[in-house]
């Protein structure tokens, strides 16, 4: 199980690296899907089934819509692929930063965290992630609405930015 968790963590980092190297929106969506599937599988193996399902629906329902709009509005005739030198340079630099972070974290010895699941202990009969979802929708409804409006505003900002220099609000005067 430890090797499986290590493999999921490595695949999650590689998916994030695929999004961060950003060769083109065509290829960035592949990294996003890989990172979301592996991240939700990682949460599922820790026992957080409901949160994993909700995150999977949000990532694939919300983020892929933004990528579809970006791809349709910023179509490149010759997109950069994974093998281009600039994309490979980004990937190598991100991996170098990750290795430096792991080395510094090993020197500081901050990796003694352990793995904690969401199973309740003792007389409790409700899992902790289900009770957290109930608290989220009861006490946190105001912040939930603010976050929804923020995501809607972000969608409109991204659509306006990728619309083009000649038609959008950001253009040369």
Swiss-Prot record:
It catalyses: a ubiquinone + NADH + 5 H(+)(in) = a ubiquinol + NAD(+) + 4 H(+)(out). Its EC number is 7.1.1.2. It is found in: Mitochondrion membrane. The chain crosses the membrane at residues 1-21, 27-47, 48-68, 87-107, 139-159. It is an enzyme of class 7 (translocase). Its main location: mitochondrion. One of its GO terms (molecular function) is NADH dehydrogenase (ubiquinone) activity. It comes from the Eukaryota. It is a multi-pass membrane protein. One of its GO terms (cellular component) is mitochondrial membrane. Keywords: Electron transport, Membrane, Mitochondrion, NAD, Respiratory chain, Translocase, Transmembrane, Transmembrane helix, Transport, Ubiquinone. The keyword Mitochondrion applies. Core subunit of the mitochondrial membrane respiratory chain NADH dehydrogenase (Complex I) that is believed to belong to the minimal assembly required for catalysis. Complex I functions in the transfer of electrons from NADH to the respiratory chain. The immediate electron acceptor for the enzyme is believed to be ubiquinone. Belongs to the complex I subunit 6 family. This is NADH-ubiquinone oxidoreductase chain 6. It comes from Synthliboramphus hypoleucus.
């Amino acid at each position: 199980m430890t090797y499986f968790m290590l493999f999921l963590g490595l695949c999650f980092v590689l998916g994030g690296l695929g999004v961060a190297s950003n060769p083109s929106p065509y290829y960035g969506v592949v990294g996003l899907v890989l990172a979301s599937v592996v991240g939700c599988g990682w949460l599922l193996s820790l026992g957080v089934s409901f949160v994993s399902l909700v995150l999977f629906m949000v990532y694939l329902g919300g983020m892929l819509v933004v990528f579809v709009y970006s791809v349709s509005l910023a179509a490149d005739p010759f997109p950069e692929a994974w093998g281009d030198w600039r994309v490979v340079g980004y990937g190598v630099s991100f991996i170098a930063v990750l290795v430096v972070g792991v080395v510094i974290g090993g020197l500081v010895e901050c990796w003694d965290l352990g793995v904690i699941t969401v199973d309740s202990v003792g007389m409790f009969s409700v899992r902790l992630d289900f009770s957290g979802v109930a608290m989220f929708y009861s006490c946190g409804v105001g912040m939930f609405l603010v976050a929804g409006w923020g995501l809607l505003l972000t969608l409109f900002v991204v659509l306006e930015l990728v619309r083009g220099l000649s038609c959008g609000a950001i253009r040369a005067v």
